[in-house]
From Swiss-Prot:
It comes from Psychromonas ingrahamii (strain DSM 17664 / CCUG 51855 / 37). One of its GO terms (molecular function) is sodium:proton antiporter activity. It is found in: Cell inner membrane. This is Na(+)/H(+) antiporter NhaA 2. Keywords: Antiport, Cell inner membrane, Cell membrane, Ion transport, Membrane, Sodium, Sodium transport, Transmembrane, Transmembrane helix, Transport. Belongs to the NhaA Na(+)/H(+) (TC 2.A.33) antiporter family.
Length: 475
């Protein structure tokens, strides 16, 4: 949590003076004035799902309206500039898919690193169960798709049903939040993060065509340089931004999809603050003591220059006392949720929707493999892996969660919209017929998974676990 925000929200002269009696008072007062971080995260994800839904509906309407030609023109509109003999331009769709989506994957990388260092993945027992469930939820859908497309040129799409859309899945779960334990939401977040790791590895290894060893070596060298700089204590954001852009560009030129660079660069972002907690509290306490001695007037950072500088000092202490990784993650949360992902949905979700096209999609091996992979494969893979993990004591479920909750969550995990669509655009970029079928089936499977999961959690799981549901409803 950003201590600067906590401090500024709770700042008043009476609250400051009390810190001299209790060195933790500032933190406690700030924490009391805001929602728990995970609740804020859930709310942000639910909001993101609304924006994604609006963008998706807009794309579907646009692509099926009388203005569909303008939709296609927008997607393929060339954007760029000329500088002498240098020409840099690309279609809007490629700019979003190869450029803006790197920011999304960078954000995912920050989440992964935080979870491994300080989240559920930092606890061995939780980590084992999450990884086991995620592997089941990736392998089973991929196998099902491959069975339907064995020896066909569409077999390359086996990675499409492996993914879960975190924003949409969490948004769906919040609709039945009163009937499920809050720990189920946290479990889904951890599961989705491991799922994202798997999807990123699949993209890097199996959805890359020709590779330039020279550019790839340069990119990895730059990323290694960032890792060394992190170890050496370099914390300047501009340093990581400039070197990171160079690493992204060279990876793009190498042939490996640049989203992999986004994740790799994120893993080099410093996770430790410049000021250790004890030193931070000591400096803040000393500054507040100095402010307390000035009893001639009320704190006025606008009218009084000295007060202004003292408040800025505390702000700087807070900046140095928070982890860059967490600050960057917080800073990117809204831009990614409200801008990057909706734009991606807008240019990629526009497919022809009709009863006849749906029937045609479900008769195609691509569509059938994706729908059954997401709806049935995710359910069987996640819940089956969880049952095996409990049966053989490989791991345990968080408190308040039972198998009925896991079954409902595994159905909702079949919502694979963003990442599944992204993998489809990579696998079927030169096969527009397959791509159209894949996009339509992803939408249908995601909608069906959401309906089945919500009905199960609302009707069956809630009845079998009334105590946990009622307790959660009181929170």
């Amino acid at each position: 949590m950003n201590l600067r925000i906590v401090y500024l929200r709770s700042l008043n002269i009476q609250g400051l003076t009390k810190m001299t009696d209790d060195k933790n008072n500032l933190l406690h007062r700030g924490l009391d004035n805001i929602q728990p971080p995970f609740s804020n995260f859930i709310r942000a994800q639910a909001t993101a799902s609304v924006f994604l839904l609006v963008a998706t509906i807009t794309a579907l309407w646009w692509a099926n309206s009388d203005y569909s030609s303008t939709y296609q023109m927008l997607k393929h509109m060339q954007i760029g500039f000329f500088l002498g003999d240098i020409e840099l331009q690309a279609s809007l769709k490629h700019i979003i898919n190869d450029g803006l989506m790197v920011i999304f994957f960078f954000f995912i990388g920050l989440e992964i690193k935080r979870e491994v260092l300080a989240g559920d993945l930092a606890i061995a027992e939780n980590r084992r169960m999450l990884i086991l469930c995620a592997l089941g939820g990736m392998i089973c859908p991929a196998v099902i798709y491959s069975l339907f497309n064995w020896s066909l040129d569409s077999q390359i799409g086996w990675g499409i049903p492996m993914a879960t859309d975190t924003a949409f899945a969490l948004g769906a779960l919040t609709l039945v939040r009163k009937h499920i334990p809050i720990s189920l939401l946290a479990f889904l977040v951890g599961l989705a993060i491991v799922d994202d790791v798997g999807a990123i590895v699949v993209i890097a290894l199996f959805y890359t065509q020709e590779i330039s060893v020279i550019f790839l070596s340069i990119s990895f060298s730059l990323i290694a340089f960032l890792a060394i700089a992190n170890y050496a204590g370099v914390l300047r954001p501009i340093f990581y931004i400039l070197i990171g852009i160079a690493a992204w560009w060279t990876m793009l030129k190498s042939g490996v999809h640049p989203t992999f660079a986004g994740v790799a660069i994120a893993l080099t972002v410093p996770a430790r603050p410049m000021l250790p907690p004890d030193e931070l509290l000591s400096k803040v306490k000393a500054k507040i003591t100095a402010m307390k001695k000035n009893k001639g007037h009320q704190l006025d950072a606008l009218a009084n220059r000295e007060d202004h500088e003292q408040v800025l000092d505390v702000r700087d202490f807070a900046e140095h006392g928070s982890a860059p990784l967490r600050r960057w993650e917080d800073a990117l949360d809204l831009p990614v949720s409200l801008f990057v992902l909706p734009l991606f949905a807008l240019v990629n979700a526009g497919v022809e929707v009709s009863f006849s096209s749906l029937i045609e999609t479900l008769q195609h091996s691509v569509g059938l493999g994706i729908v059954i992979g997401l709806v049935i494969g995710k359910f069987v893979g996640i819940s089956g892996a969880c049952w095996l993990g409990l049966r053989y004591k490989i791991g345990s479920l968080p408190e308040g969660i039972n198998m009925q909750h896991v079954i409902g969550m595994s159905l909702i995990a079949g919502i694979g919209f963003t990442m599944s669509t992204f993998i489809a655009t990579l696998g079927f970029d030169s096969q527009p017929e397959y791509l159209q079928s894949a996009k339509g089936s992803i939408l249908f499977a995601s909608l069906l998974s959401a309906i089945l999961g919500l009905l199960y959690l609302r009707i069956i799981a809630a009845k079998k676990a009334p105590n946990s549901a009622s307790k959660n409803g009181e929170n």
